[in-house]
Amino acid sequence: RTYNAETRELAVEVKGRAIEKDAYITAIVTQSGIVARQSGATGEYVHNNAPRAFLTAPKGDKLELDAEGNYTVTYTYTIPATVGSFECLPENMDVAVLVHGNISDPESRLVYNADQVSVVPEVSSAAMRAMSLYTNDIDVDIFNVELKPVCEQICR
């Protein structure tokens, strides 16, 4: 993923190989550290992992696979200054990615893999890590908008 602080544009590219022909991907931008009231709690409550935007359809986008089962998808999103009355702080935001079966089919509601990466890297761009998901033959790598890997390999 790449994030431009001046334009607030986030770009996420996901590449991999699916082992299931009927695979979907869901990508969600979340925010943590939101202090607000909550029903049933007294005083202020810290809300974490609150969904801010879906980069895909809520039930996922069907992955278009080539003959070998490979896929590449790219999403861009401009983070707004606020959602409702709450400030959007990119340094408190993550992108969560799930590769899964067809949520509409009760027999296929499996999540094959999932991971998340911070919108704003916690390290310098030279040391930034790519996000990869590994389950069977599924992996996800994050590339910048020029389709260059963010770093050489996963460090998680």
Report the location of each language-model feature.
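Short, conserved sequence motifs used for protein processing/export or organelle targeting and
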Residues: 1-127
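Intrinsic disorder/low-complexity segments enriched in polar/small residues
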Residues: 117, 123, 147-149, 153-154
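Surface-exposed, proline-anchored Ser/Thr-rich loop/turn motifs
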Residues: 129-152
